[in-house]
């Protein structure tokens, strides 16, 4: 594992057949990360990663049948999710562009990180939060405890969006954890006025 004394900048991963980048533990800080047209998640976080990130850019490859998430974020190491530290990265100024048929985030296993001042567009929906029955150590509890935060983010051009129900339509199941997360301070469904130049991603 790499500690917070290390900063990694200007990394591009293009057209990989797996994840773009995986953070498994540690506290390394990163800036200017570009994950383009990879076939699995763009940003995969697990095993207690607690670094800081800024300017994370992702554009998802459409592989059909529901492409993978923009980010799959796990909190702890299986099978015991109660062990500290659970993952808690802090990310600012991310821009993620989906493949239209995939979710932006899958959050699970006691993950408790933060995203602020970011843009997520062209996904099917924003959040899937997994909450195992009978467990007090879940990402849902991290939302309740105030340690899983999404504040002042823009969501746009999502297939599941319904103007009548608003932000609540951007959740996978519409459960209480997902609704609480999308409803946090400053989140909005609005056109970021960004234009993507066409590319096949091949």
Regions found by a protein language model. Give the residues of each.
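Extracellular beta-rich repeat passengers
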Residues: 1-18, 22-202
């Amino acid at each position: 594992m790499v500690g917070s004394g290390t900063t990694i900048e200007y990394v591009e991963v293009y057209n990989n057949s797996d994840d773009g980048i995986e953070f498994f533990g540690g506290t390394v800080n990163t800036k200017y990360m570009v994950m383009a047209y990879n076939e699995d998640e763009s940003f995969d976080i697990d095993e207690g990663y607690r670094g800081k990130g800024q300017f994370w850019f992702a554009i998802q490859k459409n592989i059909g049948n529901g492409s993978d998430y923009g980010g799959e974020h796990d909190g702890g190491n299986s099978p015991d999710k109660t062990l500290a530290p659970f993952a808690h990265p802090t990310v600012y100024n991310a821009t993620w562009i989906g493949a239209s048929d995939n979710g932006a985030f899958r959050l699970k296993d006691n993950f408790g990180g933060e995203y602020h001042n970011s843009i997520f567009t062209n996904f099917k929906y924003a959040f899937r939060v997994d909450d195992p029955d009978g467990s007090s150590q879940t990402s849902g509890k991290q939302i309740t405890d105030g340690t899983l935060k999404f504040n002042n983010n823009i969501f746009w051009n999502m297939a599941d969006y319904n103007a009548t129900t608003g932000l609540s339509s951007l959740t996978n199941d519409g459960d209480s954890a997902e609704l609480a997360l999308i409803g946090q301070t400053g989140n909005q469904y609005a056109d970021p006025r960004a234009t993507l130049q066409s590319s096949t991603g091949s």
